[in-house]
Amino acid sequence: MAQMRIKDIAAEAGVSPATVSRYLNNRPGQMTEETRARIAAVIERTGYRPRAAARNLRSSRTNLIGVILADIANPFSSAMLEGLSSSAAARGCSLMTAISGNDPAKEAESLARLIDAGVDGLVVNTCGGNDEAIVAAAGRLPVVLLDRDVADGGIDLVTSNNRELVAGLVDALAAAGSERLCLLTEASDDSPVRRERAEAFAEELSRRGLAGEVVTLADGGATGVGRLDEAIRGYAGKKLGLIAVNGLVFLRLTEALAQLGPSLPAGLKIATFDDYPWNHVLFGGVTTAAQDTLAIAERVVERLSERIDVVTTTVGEAAKLAPKRIEVPGRIEHRPSTSR
């Protein structure tokens, strides 16, 4: 009799090969008892045994980590991918990476594809709109969220201390004499990080009695320039301070300011999130809330490894590892853009 394979077991049990794989991995998720019983009966009747080189039982691993990133065009994402790769390699693991392009449908497809590929765990930098799918995935295998949370998911999250960093940037602009502040953000509000920073910004303005608003820069073209010009003209005669909510928005801000040119008010101060080489050059050096991307990546892989260890060594213990929100401290790099 020919060697039985997973697809043969699946055909006889009337299920997909992925379902058989989850059964063999002790990751049943929402699999019914009836489905489990059918698979078990076929395995017992055929005497199926996975080949040693290919089996994915609890006692062994694929050493593959699935990574889903929302926007590779964001410099934060490319820096994070490098850090995740290094941290995973140090533990003998490789990455399988998917880019959703801020498309919830692509993100959902990536979740399913990576799970079916047999990764040991998932790192998800969600674009939003897939909370239920991500929570369901976390019921099937270890998941750690990168930078962006989901609602009521009870899933580990590793992020920066965003509220403290916002306060630090407001401090820098206030000390530089700014009388009105604008937080520049993107059109979409799907990012929990951008929402958290906007909320923290509003709280800081209220606490300090400062005037300001959140301004949307839709893109680096005419729309973004026009909106910024409106904000600047609305604060005529006031010393204005601008904060870019992330590195991508900062690049859009830089383009918009270049187009506005001579109409810029005297004493304009600028600060941003995300520290990249151009921050040291543009505007004579830009005061920056620098996230520790390497430390964030290390903590993500470390936490995911802890969950994988539990799943692969102790039956039923995964749920006992309580979810954590891990905030990795960033720092404020003070530069000439906020000097008096």
Regions found by a protein language model. Give the residues of each.
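Short, solvent-exposed amphipathic alpha-helices that sit
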Residues: R38, F76-A90, L165-L169, P192-A211, ...
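Short beta-strand elements in bilobed, periplasmic/extracellular small-molecule ligand-binding domains
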Residues: A88-I99, R180-L184, A198, A202-T223
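An alpha-beta-alpha
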Residues: L169-R208, G316-S337
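Amphipathic helical "hinge" segments at domain boundaries
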Residues: E33-A37, T46-R113, A117-D120, E199
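Hydrophobic alpha-helical segments within soluble ligand-binding/sensing domains
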Residues: D156-L183, A222-E230, Q291-T312
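N-terminal helix-turn-helix DNA-binding module of bacterial transcription factors
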Residues: M1-T62
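Flexible loop/turn connectors
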Residues: R233-R340
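Flexible loop/hinge segments that line or gate small-molecule binding clefts
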Residues: V124-G168, S188, L248, D274-V286
